[in-house]
């Protein structure tokens, strides 16, 4: 039996959103690697760079709204401010976590976002996962852990920063989906509303956060044409990365975004080996293979869960609430009464 045309178009759109996210995310990592590494341009101001990203995204959103390419719906300012604060805490905490912890523990903290997102979705939205989904998530976590985790050293400050980063990032990603549903706004509409707030706050606070991280102010950096080109390229890719993130979470869920998002980790490791002569060991290859298998199983498990939900939906439609039964009874009694009255008036 062939799928309806609408389902085919939806599937193509889903694949397109994921492809945009993977390509733009991997591209921005490669651009930032060249921009920020000591062998590149040595631009060590990650938080301020993120401010540039959101400023560029906000500019694109303003142009889109001004030209009528996208509509603007109302979202309360306090919701936008709350979301932006959580998102900015996530960015700053991630940078501090990377500075204070070993690379191995930093990777473990990033992997822990998957179960944390699952738990938060269960607490906030009463979302439950079948055993197949839970098993596939574990396979992905194990696979990515094998290929990325090396030395693991923990300290108190680093642990607190890592916990803050994991919680705030997980909450931010869940909020993207819930805000879109709550106010019936599209992914780009929501992004165009939050980007200006994040841009202003990050451009004001970013240089001070970067000073704490690197001991240098951005004003001391000697700009070159090469660095400016990499910054502009990074900003352009950030627009697509941000849009596709909101698209993917809006279409799927924060959990799916986290699980399938680790395809980016696999791509980054592979491109690092091809373009930057990074070491590729058997451990890396085995871990990537396990992670990919886990992602395939996850996709299958989610599809199985959807089919189960679809089968249970028709039965639910036939069941009526007490209020519906009461209204139906009242309607029948009213009809019977009218028939009796009409019958009495007949000769």
Swiss-Prot record:
Widely expressed in the whole plant. Disruption phenotype: No visible phenotype. Slight reduction of galactose content in the cell wall composition. GO terms for biological process: GDP-fucose transmembrane transport; plant-type primary cell wall biogenesis; response to nematode; UDP-galactose transmembrane transport; UDP-glucose transmembrane transport. GO terms for cellular component: Golgi apparatus; Golgi membrane. It comes from the Eukaryota. GO terms for molecular function: antiporter activity; GDP-fucose transmembrane transporter activity; transmembrane transporter activity; UDP-galactose transmembrane transporter activity; UDP-glucose transmembrane transporter activity. Keywords: Antiport, Golgi apparatus, Membrane, Sugar transport, Transmembrane, Transmembrane helix, Transport. It is found in: Golgi apparatus membrane. The chain crosses the membrane at residues 11-31, 43-63, 80-100, 103-123, 132-152, 159-179, 195-215, 223-243, 256-276, 285-305. It is a multi-pass membrane protein. Nucleotide-sugar transporter that transports UDP-rhamnose or UDP-galactose and UMP in a strict counter-exchange mode. PANTHER family: SOLUTE CARRIER FAMILY 35. Belongs to the TPT transporter family. TPT (TC 2.A.7.9) subfamily. This is UDP-rhamnose/UDP-galactose transporter 1. The gene is URGT1.
């Amino acid at each position: 039996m062939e799928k309806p045309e609408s389902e085919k178009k939806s599937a193509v759109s889903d694949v397109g959103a994921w492809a945009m996210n993977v390509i733009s995310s991997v591209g921005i990592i490669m651009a930032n690697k060249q921009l920020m590494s000591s062998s590149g341009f040595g631009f060590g101001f990650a938080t301020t760079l993120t401010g540039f990203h959101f400023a560029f995204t906000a500019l694109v959103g303003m142009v889109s709204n001004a030209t009528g390419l996208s509509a603007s719906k109302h979202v309360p300012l306090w919701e936008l401010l709350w979301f932006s604060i959580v998102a900015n805490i996530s960015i700053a905490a991630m940078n501090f976590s990377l500075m204070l912890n070993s690379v191995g523990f930093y990777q473990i903290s990033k992997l822990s976002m998957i179960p944390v997102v699952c738990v938060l979705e269960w607490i906030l939205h009463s979302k439950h996962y079948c055993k197949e989904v839970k098993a596939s998530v574990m396979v992905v976590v194990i696979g990515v852990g094998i290929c990325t985790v090396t030395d693991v050293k923990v300290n108190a400050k680093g642990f607190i920063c890592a916990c803050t980063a994991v919680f705030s990032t997980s909450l931010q990603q869940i909020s993207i989906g819930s805000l879109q549903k709550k106010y019936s706004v599209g992914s780009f509409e929501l992004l165009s509303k939050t980007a200006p707030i994040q841009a202003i706050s990050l451009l004001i606070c970013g240089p001070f956060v970067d000073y704490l991280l690197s001991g240098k102010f951005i004003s001391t950096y000697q700009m070159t044409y090469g660095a400016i080109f990499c910054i502009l390229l990074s900003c352009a890719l950030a627009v697509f990365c941000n849009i596709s993130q909101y698209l993917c979470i809006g279409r799927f869920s924060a959990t799916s975004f986290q699980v399938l998002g680790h395809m980016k980790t696999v791509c980054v490791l592979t491109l690092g080996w091809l373009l930057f002569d990074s070491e590729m060991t058997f451990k890396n290859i085995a871990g990537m293979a396990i992670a990919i298998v886990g992602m395939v199983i996850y996709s299958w498990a989610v599809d199985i869960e959807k089919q189960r939900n679809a089968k249970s939906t028709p039965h639910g439609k036939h069941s009526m609430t007490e209020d519906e039964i009461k209204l139906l009874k009242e309607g029948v009694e009213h009809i019977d009464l009218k028939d009796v009255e009409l019958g009495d008036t007949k000769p």
